[in-house]
């Protein structure tokens, strides 16, 4: 299966209103799709996110010339070379070559990986809670209410981007709106030190619906993570920027996390992403993929979760949920899956089992201008 053509699709959308987290406001969303085509006509799609000018130059000047003429079945060695140049680009290539392998074998991605344990996966609605409005709390509450009406039973909201007192006011308002039957995840984006993060414990002891506390501290403080995990009454999660299982090993060995959160687009390819999930099972901790930046990478996270052994024997709580971006972002619809009552059914067709929405691709193609 010789690679004969590679197409690129840099996509850009400027937001109507900025939204954000503790790292600041987002004013646009981007996506970079690639399509690898073999001499037999079998194709596969990949996705990554980074600064579009750098990605486009990297693909057109180096990665595409390197891949042309290579065998699509040599995924591991090709991805290993590309990750030395650009890790996120390597992840996109990994996805595309995985789909080609599945189509060549006349099966789905899940079947290529040995088959699925389950037909559907739970997802949680992921919010960027902060806005530049003085009434940001009421706006956040309205956004959450709208998604709860669509059937979501788990949500993730942001903390750590404003004063502790104001964050508490925000979460109390959401608790009043959502009720204790809705699982709530709090994501601090590494904003705190250990003392500030521990202040939340007084509220965790009252709120019975907290799913986990996500990335409360920078990861250069593993001893504080271990201490915090031992003292909090809710699970501690994190690791969305880890590049592979080797970076998780010291964190898991020191018992820093209850839940690891690898991201398909942040690790060194889909194979290492799956290695991260399996590593969690070996250490007896949970794995809930971070999947905020792209719909195709989220689909691969869903495939991997479908093929992952259960973490528990508890009925209706044996597999961890996957993140589902519900903010303004047209690229979330590049893949035509939609949750129903907080669950997503896994496609069964060949390859990824669905088509890329070319209408969205054509509408939002980046024109090369500065942003």
Swiss-Prot record:
Keywords: Isomerase, Magnesium, Metal-binding. CDD domains: MR_like (cd03316). GO terms for molecular function: hydro-lyase activity; isomerase activity; magnesium ion binding. One of its GO terms (biological process) is carbohydrate catabolic process. Disulfide bonds: none annotated. Its EC number is 5.-.-.-. The keyword Heme does not apply. The keyword Transmembrane does not apply. InterPro entries: Enolase-like_C_sf, Enolase-like_N, Enolase_C-like, Mandelate_racemase_C, Mandelate_racemase_N_dom, RHMD-like. Its cofactor is Mg(2+). Divalent metal cations. Mg(2+). Mg(2+) binds at residues 214, 240, 290. The active site is at residues 158, 290. Homooctamer. Belongs to the mandelate racemase/muconate lactonizing enzyme family. This is Putative isomerase YitF. It comes from Bacillus subtilis (strain 168). The gene is yitF.
